[in-house]
């Protein structure tokens, strides 16, 4: 039995993030109590009492560290001794270039490793309110299906608008894939908001024929069904899926997110667009733009097809496609500090999907970082954040401050995000020529840029590990 509350970290939630956090803390020599409410209280989605149970897909997505941001995240986590990645590698099933796992074997491996660790105590039972005040170091990683009593307690502590119970996600496009020979920068009525200059949006014009074809495609496109535990997820008028708006009438979108008023196309100022799609800057780096009002339940293939019919987005590269799911997540940029601590009560640290990351690997990676921070704090050691040039640092930066909220974005403009190269700081000297000396163009230029970002990330992570976590460097 673990009895020292001062040097003990309590981790609440035995999913991917909580399991990874507990492992990292214990591996750093700090005692852990891992609290998991299953099987005493099950969720609508879980079917076992196993830790790190995968409730949806069994895929961890691409394992290509050189060309894919999530593959890079895999590599970084392996360098840091991730339990989740170790269990995934040991239970891999064939999936081409992706890392997919035997879900039961994966969960069993994580559960066994945590149960057998001498510094980890597993307690089964629901936490029905905020952690007791004598728990000095806490990581809350209860995920998208956080129990109602705990969610209510967190909301009471942080404020009414601090916690969301569903996500309404609009697609996000890489800025450099937008055709600016068609699109232009302008805010509606040239309005200047905080930090803006009156030209803060990218605008894509449509003719009547293009608009009517677009609306028809939205209505006829294949939609994703709600999962069983999402069937009562409410639609709010401020976050209606765009295809639902289209179904309400042919002109609904023209009087909603696609209204053409207050905007003039400088490329053809005498012609009034019939409708306009606006994209708003999504990150401080200015590398990502979201389609305003385009939250959707369309299937991903349909989104790519339909949204690339928008003038200026014919070759759009999507950093994230849209969706609407049941979820529980914080308005993290406002509520959490750079070490994932709750500003209102710093003994509480959050991790995983609750912080506003999306995806198995992303959740586990934030659990990893939260675990490292919690262990360092329990040992009275200062830990520098991972470099923003790494996948871990880029994702952490987005959660804790990289997102921007414009004056008209609404109180819930922060939405969950997968890791993607758009979150990374730009290269100081992007590659311009290939190994053969020829000038890089088109897809070759994009591939070279991604590979350069990955190489920089891994080199910078090695330096950070050597300086801050010498034990991990020795193990690697």
Curated annotation (Swiss-Prot):
Cofactor(s) in the UniProt record: FAD
E.C. code: 2.1.1.74
Catalytic activity: uridine(54) in tRNA + (6R)-5,10-methylene-5,6,7,8-tetrahydrofolate + NADH + H(+) = 5-methyluridine(54) in tRNA + (6S)-5,6,7,8-tetrahydrofolate + NAD(+); uridine(54) in tRNA + (6R)-5,10-methylene-5,6,7,8-tetrahydrofolate + NADPH + H(+) = 5-methyluridine(54) in tRNA + (6S)-5,6,7,8-tetrahydrofolate + NADP(+)
GO MF annotation: an example: flavin adenine dinucleotide binding
EC top class, as a word: transferase
Biological processes annotated in GO: tRNA methylation; tRNA wobble uridine modification
Cited InterPro entries: FAD/NAD-bd_sf (IPR036188), MnmG-rel (IPR002218), MnmG-rel_CS (IPR020595), MnmG_N (IPR040131), TrmFO (IPR004417)
GO cellular component, one term: cytosol
Keyword Ribosomal protein assigned: no
Range of residues in the leader sequence: none
Subcellular location: Cytoplasm
Positions of FAD binding: 13-18
Region described as Disordered: spans on this chain: 425-446
Cited PANTHER family: GLUCOSE INHIBITED DIVISION PROTEIN A, METHYLENETETRAHYDROFOLATE--TRNA-(URACIL-5-)-METHYLTRANSFERASE TRMFO
Similarity section: Belongs to the MnmG family. TrmFO subfamily.
Name of the protein in question: Methylenetetrahydrofolate--tRNA-(uracil-5-)-methyltransferase TrmFO
């Amino acid at each position: 039995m673990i009895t020292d509350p001062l040097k003990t970290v309590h981790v609440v939630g035995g999913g991917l993030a909580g399991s990874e956090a507990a492992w990292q803390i214990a591996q750093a020599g700090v005692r852990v109590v891992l609290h998991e409410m299953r099987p005493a209280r099950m969720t609508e989605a879980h079917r076992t009492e196993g830790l790190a149970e995968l409730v949806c897909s069994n895929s961890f997505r691409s394992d290509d560290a050189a060309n894919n941001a999530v593959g890079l995240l895999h590599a970084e986590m392996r360098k840091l001794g991730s339990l989740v990645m170790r269990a995934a590698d040991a239970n891999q099933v064939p999936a081409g270039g992706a890392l997919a796992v035997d879900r039961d074997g994966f969960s069993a491996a994580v559960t066994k490793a945590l149960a057998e660790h001498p510094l980890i105590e597993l307690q089964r039972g629901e936490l029905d309110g905020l952690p007791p005040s004598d728990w000095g170091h806490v990581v809350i990683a209860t995920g998208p299906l956080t129990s109602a009593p705990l969610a209510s307690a967190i909301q009471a502590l942080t404020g009414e608008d601090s916690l969301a119970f569903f996500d309404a996600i609009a697609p996000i496009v890489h800025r450099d894939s937008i055709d600016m020979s068609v699109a232009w920068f302008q805010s509606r009525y040239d309005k200047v908001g905080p930090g803006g200059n009156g030209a803060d949006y990218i605008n894509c014009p449509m003719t009547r024929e293009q608009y009517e074809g677009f609306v028809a495609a939205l209505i006829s496109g294949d939609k994703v069904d709600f999962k069983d535990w999402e069937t009562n997820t409410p639609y709010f008028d401020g976050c209606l899926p765009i295809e639902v708006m289209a179904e309400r009438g042919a002109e609904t979108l023209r009087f909603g997110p696609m209204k053409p008023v207050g905007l003039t196309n400088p490329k053809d100022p005498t012609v009034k667009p019939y409708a306009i799609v606006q994209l708003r800057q999504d990150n401080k780096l200015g590398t990502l733009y979201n389609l305003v009002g385009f939250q959707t339940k369309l299937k991903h293939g349909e989104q790519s097809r339909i949204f690339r019919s928008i003038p200026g987005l014919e070759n759009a590269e999507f950093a994230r496609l849209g969706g609407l799911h049941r979820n529980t997540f914080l308005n993290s940029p406002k509520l959490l500090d750079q070490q994932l601590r709750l500003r209102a009560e710093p003994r509480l640290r959050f991790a995983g999907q609750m912080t506003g990351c999306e995806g198995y690997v992303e959740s586990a990676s934030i659990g990893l970082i939260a675990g490292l921070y919690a262990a360092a704090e329990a040992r009275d050691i200062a830990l520098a954040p991972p470099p923003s040039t790494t996948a871990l640092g880029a994702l952490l930066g987005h959660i804790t401050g990289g997102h921007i909220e414009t004056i008209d974005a609404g109180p819930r403009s922060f939405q969950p995000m997968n890791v993607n190269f758009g979150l990374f700081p730009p290269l100081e000297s992007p590659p311009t020529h290939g190994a053969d000396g020829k000038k890089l163009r088109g897809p070759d230029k994009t591939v070279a840029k991604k590979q350069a970002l990955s190489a920089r990330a891994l080199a910078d992570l090695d330096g950070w590990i050597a300086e801050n976590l010498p034990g991990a460097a020795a193990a690697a």
